[in-house]
Amino acid sequence: VRLRLKIDYAVCEKLCVPAEGRAELTLAPGNSVHNADLSAAEARVPKQVTAAQAGLTARRVTTGAKPQVAVDLAAPPGQPIELFVEGPTPKWALPIPKPAKPASNGQAQFSFDLDGMPPGVDAKSPVDLTFTVVTGDRAVEVKSRLD
């Protein structure tokens, strides 16, 4: 079995620079020296859960100059937490959510500008977003509709 990976992505600050990565791995049938590595990598793949299971809620906030999204989610005590967001298609380039305030009482709050949408998309229209929550060695993926 030959595994091939090609990934197109962008590194963004003020300007997005496209990049590409490729990797290939050939696996022989049966046990392999790579089994442990593959199992470890598979364990790190985000597991899909519901918004309720992740304790995640997302809502629009329109008090500032730009529309923002505020995200509340369950946060295990004593563990760092990261949040990433994707739009419904690869044409979306949403910013990385930033912590709105330090996690406390089992809750974390993040926010991000509703920016990086494809041309012609209304920032006020409903949209399906995918959130990836990373805490320690665990990652989950949550699909949520922003009305």
What are these regions (language model features)?
Residues 1-147:
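Structural recognition of alpha-helix starts/caps
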